[in-house]
Amino acid sequence: NGWNENKNYILIGSAAWAGLVLLVGTLNYLVI
């Protein structure tokens, strides 16, 4: 059970980072 929760946190964290990177990249593309 603990391992499953860890996996969920890793997935959510990865998705959050991916979204953040995409957002920053899009903003940079629009600004420049």
From Swiss-Prot:
UniProt keyword annotation of Nucleotide-binding present: no
Domain of life, per lineage: Eukaryota
Any GO BP annotation: photosynthesis
Topology term for the membrane: Single-pass membrane protein
One matching Pfam family: Ycf9
SUPFAM superfamilies: PsbZ-like
Regions that span the bilayer: 12-32
Disulphides: none
InterPro entries in UniProt: PSII_PsbZ, PSII_PsbZ_sf
Keywords noted in UniProt: Chloroplast, Membrane, Photosynthesis, Photosystem II, Plastid, Reaction center, Thylakoid, Transmembrane, Transmembrane helix
Listed GO CC annotations: chloroplast thylakoid membrane; photosystem II reaction center
Subcellular location: Plastid, Chloroplast thylakoid membrane
Family label: Belongs to the PsbZ family.
Function text: May control the interaction of photosystem II (PSII) cores with the light-harvesting antenna, regulates electron flow through the 2 photosystem reaction centers. PSII is a light-driven water plastoquinone oxidoreductase, using light energy to abstract electrons from H(2)O, generating a proton gradient subsequently used for ATP formation.
Subunit structure as annotated in this protein's UniProt entry: PSII is composed of 1 copy each of membrane proteins PsbA, PsbB, PsbC, PsbD, PsbE, PsbF, PsbH, PsbI, PsbJ, PsbK, PsbL, PsbM, PsbT, PsbY, PsbZ, Psb30/Ycf12, at least 3 peripheral proteins of the oxygen-evolving complex and a large number of cofactors. It forms dimeric complexes.
Protein name as annotated: Photosystem II reaction center protein Z
Annotated source species: Euglena anabaena (Euglenaria anabaena)
Phylogenetic placement of the source organism: Eukaryota, Discoba, Euglenozoa, Euglenida, Spirocuta
